Amino acid sequence: MAEETQHNKLAAAKKKLKEYWQKNRPRVPAGVNRNRKTNGSIPETATSGGCQPPGDSATGFHREGPTSSATLKDLESPCQERAVVLDSTSVKISRLKNTIKSLKQQKKQVEHQLEEEKKANNERQKAERELEVQIQTLIIQKEELNTDLYHMERSLRYFEEESKDLAVRLQHSLQCKGELESALSAVIATEKKKANQLSSCSKAHTEWELEQSLQDQALLKAQLTQLKESFQQLQLERDECAEHIEGERARWHQRMSKMSQEICTLKKEKQQDMRRVEELERSLSKLKNQMAEPLPPEPPAVPSEVELQHLRKELERVAGELQSQVKNNQHISLLNRRQEERIREQEERLRKQEERLQEQHEKLRQLAKPQSVFEELNNENKSTLQLEQQVKELQEKLGEEHLEAASQQNQQLTAQLSLMALPGEGHGGEHLDSEGEEAPRPMPSVPEDPESREAMSSFMDHLKEKADLSELVKKQELRFIQYWQERCHQKIHHLLSEPGGRAKDAALGGGHHQAGAQGGDEGEAAGAAADGIAAYSNYNNGHRKFLAAAHNSADEPGPGAPAPQELGAADKHGDLREVTLTSSAQGEAREDPLLDKPTAQPIVQDHQEHPGLGSNCCVPLFCWAWLPRRRR
């Protein structure tokens, strides 16, 4: 009975052990391994200590030594087998942990590489944005420079047209002045002849003067036609200049269109690159999300081969994705390099354009200097035109007064001739014959009648008024000449004192022909200054020769000069020879070589009154020589 109870107890204990092992499988191997490593105890004792039922102490099972030792020996063999299995599984688990750690390290390295690539992409994007901003600023600067160039060209054309108009007006005014001087000289010569030959005045002489006036009118009409033709030629030249400027504008528009097309292509390429970068960023974000997903918890049991294969496939997939990303990054880097090369080429083009624009700015600045001088000259030309208008008005007044005086003199002469003819009618034919013989005398004897005396006094009063007006005209002409003398000296000094001293070198070397290609507009201005100085010196030489001839011939009285007895009263109030502007178109005045020039006697008088003008004379109009040369 005792043996049967023992066997029953052993069977119950085995069942309980099996149930216990089935319930606590993952805990038992770990405890066994720990007991092995730390204490070095036998697994049997551990199992027996861990598997002892709670009721054995009460039943007295542990008191029976031989029976319990036998059962423990029987249980030792499966426990050892299970310990070996647990050792193999622990080795596999450690290997898997090592692989997981290596994968984590690879993951960290890949994330680090991705972060570096992202930083590089961000830096590239920043550089591209900066380049876009620079390109936009350069485009804006280019547009501003183009507008400035357009306005400067318009202002230059406007100033050139104004200068042409002023030059034409000055020439026309000078021609009118010469014509008025010739007309005045002709009128004064006729008045002298009338004063010298009161008896020889007749209807034939007046008709001859009318014919001459008609001829003068015909000449004036011919001159007007010539002026109209020259005006038409100037208009044609202006049209040609306008066509040339339109051609240049078309070229500039073509260049701007090409630049705009290139900028559009660059913008399209940049948009494509931005799209690619966004796609890459999306792929990177997806990968980060995949990497950031929580790992599944560690399996409580040993992972199977299926799970290992799944892990290997995932690793291969991740490696393939990384390789594809590396290839994409390489492709993006190549595209970025190409874009950088294109941007560099565009920067070089922009630099070249900036250099060209800077050169144009320098040229415009150099042109602005003579423009300021040219504006001053325009203002001075306006003032001279005003002075000339005043001179014209005075001359017109003189002409009207001369005509009125001539008509009055004709009436007085007819009255005197009628009075002179009355006493000769009562003495018969002998007196008529004597009058016929004495008719060709140059000067008849002036009767001492009161009417003739009144006529002579009125004539002398008219001469006094004429002398006063001529003195006013001469004063204004002297002011005009002195003013132009000072301004011409200042302008020549300004041209000679330009930066670089090129004007002086050009003046010594022969104008703008030796200024060279490097001089540019400065060489042209220097050549203009040299030409102006040469013209100035030639004018001085000719003027000195003219003054010398005038001094030599001033002492010799001309054949058409009035007698001193008749013009004694006029000499008291002013020399008539100083007032009159003798013309080469009237009678005996053509014999004197100095009287061929309408302004001979006033120049002699100016030289006598102002001796400084002969040594340092100036040209009344300082023409700019560089304006026509710039067209060439």
UniProtKB/Swiss-Prot annotation:
Biased composition (Gly residues): 508-520
Top-rank taxon, per record: Eukaryota
One Pfam family this sequence matches: GM130_C
Record-linked InterPro entries: GM130_C, GOLGA_cons_dom, Golgin_A
GO biological process, any: Golgi organization
Keywords, comma-separated and alphabetical: Coiled coil
Coiled coil: 85-150, 209-421
Start and end residues of each stretch annotated as Disordered: 1-76, 423-452, 505-524, 552-612
Entry GO terms, CC: cis-Golgi network; Golgi cis cisterna; Golgi cisterna membrane
Compositional bias (Basic and acidic residues): 427-440, 569-578
Bias (Polar residues) ranges: 38-50
Family statement: Belongs to the GOLGA6 family.
Name of the protein in its database record: Golgin subfamily A member 8O
Species of provenance: Homo sapiens (Human)
